[in-house]
Design a protein with these regions (language model features):
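Short, solvent-exposed amphipathic alpha-helical segments in soluble enzyme
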Residues: 96-99, 126-128, 169-170
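Small-aliphatic-rich amphipathic alpha-helix that forms the alpha element of a beta-alpha
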Residues: 65-69, 110, 123-166
């Protein structure tokens, strides 16, 4: 057994206990009309930002949102790696095809890395890590928006001749894959949202 299977079994136990319990208990969180409106305003206003200013940001709330995101049976097979060193950001800006020429200006880049040992069913290995990463990045986008930070998803496309260097430089193991990256920073106010 591994940590992913342990998390899966704990998830199954929680789910079984929930199904045995009565729904609608006073502990169940509900939201006021005002809270609902605020949430949907955040959803409506969220947009991708590729223009950043040089200002350090605190992404602890974004990392918290990523940690609390839904994922395959709560296994947490996709995890974030924060890149903040200028040299590493410049390297990523050259390696990730979608980030060329702008991504290094973000204060932080979050790599979404999948540990393929988490995914047990061979039929799911080709898509499930990307679905999990999608849930994480949605939470990160909304957390960035409510924190007044710009955020943009960069697809995991790396040219074949650069993949080995990327894996080595950013410490990925043979059983790990990049599912994408998020560039996050204070956005340039002169650009319309």
């Amino acid at each position: 057994m591994d940590k992913y299977q342990d998390r899966y079994l704990a998830h199954q136990k929680r789910k079984a206990e929930l199904l045995k319990s009565s729904y609608g208990t006073p502990d169940f969180q509900t939201y006021s009309k005002e809270e609902q409106d605020t949430f949907f305003t955040v959803v409506k206003n969220r947009c991708s930002q590729r223009s950043f200013v040089s200002e350090e940001i605190d992404i602890s709330n974004i990392l918290y949102a990523i940690d609390r995101s839904p994922n395959s049976c709560d296994r947490k097979g996709v995890y974030p790696v924060v890149v903040s060193e200028r040299k590493d950001k410049e390297i990523l800006s050259g390696l990730l095809v979608g980030g060329v020429g702008w991504m290094h200006r973000a204060d932080k880049i979050i790599l979404l890395i999948a540990d393929m040992d988490c995914y047990k069913n061979p039929a799911e290995k080709g898509f499930m890590p990307y679905l999990d990463a999608g849930a994480l990045l949605t939470s990160a986008y909304l957390a960035a928006e409510v924190s007044n930070y710009g955020c943009c998803f960069v697809n995991p496309n790396i040219r074949d001749e650069n993949k080995e260097f990327f894996m080595s430089r950013f410490g990925l193991k043979d059983n790990e894959i990049l599912c994408g990256a998020l560039a996050i920073g204070k956005y340039e106010l002169k650009h319309t949202r």
